[in-house]
Amino acid sequence: MTFKQKIKSHYQNLLSEKINELRFMISDLAQDAQNDAKGSAGDKHETALSMMHLEQEKLNQKLAEIIAQKNVVDKIDADAIHTKVALGSLVQTNEMLFYISAALPKIQLENKTIIAVSPQSPLGSQLMGKSLGDEVEINKNRFQIKSIE
């Protein structure tokens, strides 16, 4: 398994775990709301139910975001070799190692720190289409591309 394949696999596992965790929380909340609806009445009860529904909506929204991120990562061809920065590129700069995918938490793999950035982010959009040796500047930080996989 190549380093880029390991990165993709790590992010897929991370996102799958988060999806399962959110689904469990949503299911748990729905069950609590259903149980509360059976036996209580009154203003406090209605307020509690409303709060549960709001929390459930927030969790559903977060779940949709994470599923969308996982769909982006799933579509990446980890075997593709890039000469220009594109979705799925692993970009080594003079400062950091970037994985062009979705905005995800940074990870440590094989003693390297990988920062996942989306192509739509300020840094990602500047990196897209660049080649070996090109430079980009974000917030007065200059990044020179040392390698692209």
Residue ranges and their predicted role:
Residues 41, 48, 52-56, 85, ...:
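Alpha-helix boundary/capping detector
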